[in-house]
Design a protein with these regions (language model features):
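HotDog/MaoC-like acyl-thioester-processing domains
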Residues: 66, 71-72, 82-135
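Generic structural signal for residues positioned in beta-strands
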Residues: 7-9, 63, 108
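Short, well-ordered turn and helix-capping elements at secondary-structure junctions
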Residues: 12-16, 62-68, 99
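Hydrophobic beta-strand-centered segment that forms part of the acyl-chain substrate-binding groove
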Residues: 39-90, 106
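Hot-dog-fold acyl-thioester-processing enzymes
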Residues: 2-59, 114-135
């Protein structure tokens, strides 16, 4: 299995499924978002405190490829890796069904930092990535 910087295990809930009995497409976006937030919290990041300091992280682009559908009750492993590209922080994310590790979705999410209303060069991300390297 591919190596990841961060993983999170969760379970599909009934209300996340459509009439076909599979996870509704937008819920994969929620799964990925939740994983990113948990990852950032594990680094000590807090979006509320950042905002109070005039620093806001925004998603600038999302691309999700749907490979195999998850169903109600399925357990899954939501995984991510991260790197900086120019001013953006790029999250590469996979969701694998458990226990067989079948790839359900893969996605790329790009994020930028706006400080006091202005797009930055991503210096905040540089500091965050240094903390990851030192872990």
């Amino acid at each position: 299995m591919k190596e990841y910087l961060f993983t999170l295990t969760d379970k599909v809930r009934d209300y996340e499924c459509d009439l076909q009995g599979v996870v509704y497409n937008s819920n994969y976006h929620h799964y990925m978002e939740h994983t990113r937030h948990e990852f950032l919290e594990s680094l000590g990041e807090n979006f509320g405190k950042m905002h109070e300091q005039g620093i806001d992280a925004f998603v600038s682009k999302v691309e999700i490829q749907f490979k195999n559908s998850l169903r109600s009750g399925d357990r899954y492993l939501s995984c991510l890796n991260v790197y900086k590209q120019g001013v953006k922080l790029v999250f590469e994310q996979d969701i694998n069904r458990l226990p067989d590790n079948v790839l359900a979705t893969k996605g790329t999410v790009e994020s930028v930092i706006v400080e006091n209303g202005r797009l930055t060069r991503g210096e905040y991300f540089d500091e965050m990535l240094k903390r990851i390297e030192n872990k």
